[in-house]
């Protein structure tokens, strides 16, 4: 992760340019009108301006080795302003991040916060980065504490921040809290991330709230009715809720609309029909999938086909499927089923 545009802008606006420009920057629109933190003075010595300016440029260019020299010089100055010290620790945190030293990066970012010298926008962004890294490092309690600190200081909530909070709650098995936070995040975003819906869906699943899970997918399908991924998700919800008829119905509709084009989808539809005691329909789906070359001709699929045909009382179909499964069978179960099918098809000599 390179320094983002917000950081480059702040470098230019606070302290690394003339004092007049810094004053002008303060007159720009306030991103956090409800902030409870007082804006500190963004000032530093000419030596710190020079060294930290060079360090920031080098970090932006991916030249962390060169940046380190100037960051170290700035950190060694005992009389540097709080802003210079905070900014130097922020740069050091970025260098550690680029080196995949996440605990060290978090520690340096935290020092930048504790010194309390950064302008509000920069301070809040560093705090948010800490929460993101804590989540990444599986310090979920820490991430929640940092997000709470961010909310208190900024006096606001955002969709992204709420989604981060929901993610942490989910990892801590606090599913209702995850649902509440993620539902609010999604409601605040014009284009919520797919991962947000996945976390919300998973939280519903953990609490057995299948109706809510189904409603969530149905809302998404209303906007994108031919999205096979969403259709499969809705079918999965119905399966988990033991509503096999509904699962089979939605997959059948997808098939009728020409949306089922993979072997996996054919197999899933066949299994759904079988679970709903619609074995003839299940056998027909398997037959069609094999005929189109979509279902892979392997042991598992032939065994499934044979089992479905047996349940559909279609001995010829079962015999054909079990015969194809037999050469790669891991045990004698398929051969036993094949013998059973041959016997009841009045082909007892072959069964022996």
How would you name each of these model-derived features?
Residues 37-44, 75-81, 113-119, 148-156, ...:
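Solenoid-like repeat scaffolds
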Residues 44-53, 82-89, 119-128, 154-164, ...:
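Generic helix N-cap/helix-start motif at coil->alpha-helix transitions
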Residues 2-125, 136, 145, 160, ...:
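N-terminal leader/linker segments that initiate helical-solenoid repeat arrays
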Residues 152-257, 261:
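Solenoidal tandem-repeat scaffolds enriched in leucines and small polar residues
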